[in-house]
Amino acid sequence: MKRTKSIHHASFRKSWSARHLTPVALAVTAVFMLAGCEKSDETVSLYQNADDCSAANPGKSAECTTAYNNALKEAERTAPKYATREDCVAEFGEGQCQQAPAQAGMAPENQAQSQQSSGSFWMPLMAGYMMGRLMGGGAGFAQQPLFSSKNPASPAYGKYTDAAGKNYGAAQPGRTMTVPKTAMAPKPATTTTVTRGGFGESVAKQSTMQRSAAGTSTRSMGG
């Protein structure tokens, strides 16, 4: 009889564990799965202009043109602004800057810049743009302007960067990559001018943060 009781106790313990631990394990798994979905990346394509996009996407010429034009408007709104052409050229290189109309809320950092700007500012040319599906599964496309420097001394030299200075690798259009969904979110409008070299500093800081985040992720995966 004692042996029978012992067997029954063991069976009860196994049954209790199965009933109580399995839901906990499922709940933990569900949490990780939800976290993974929320942080999932988005696949985007990088193009230099609407023609590049149309060539890679036959039958999508209208969508490519719309995305390109929207990216240009976004670039005008969010690109780093400089009070002088010289400051912009020092950052992005000769032939890479254009004059942009002063925007509502734009304010030079000092009075000298205000007088020198004469109501207009300088900004880098849009070097390319990212194009991806609209968040939420819409039928349209989202776009994000990209900039690149041709000054070897700049941290943005030869790289695609967004208006916030985040680096997306070599400035080579026609490639596809995965980015966080936040990368395609609209950037805040530029409201002040940038000092010479200021955008390059932002790119350098962002690159350091990206490397640090990648290292942390690798260590976590490796235990």
From Swiss-Prot:
Signal peptide span: none
Pfam family membership, one: DUF1190
Comp. bias intervals (Polar residues): 204-223
Alphabetized InterPro entries for the sequence: Biofilm_formation_YgiB
Region Disordered, annotated ranges: 201-223
Protein family: Belongs to the UPF0441 family.
Designated name of the protein: UPF0441 protein YgiB
Organism: Salmonella gallinarum (strain 287/91 / NCTC 13346)
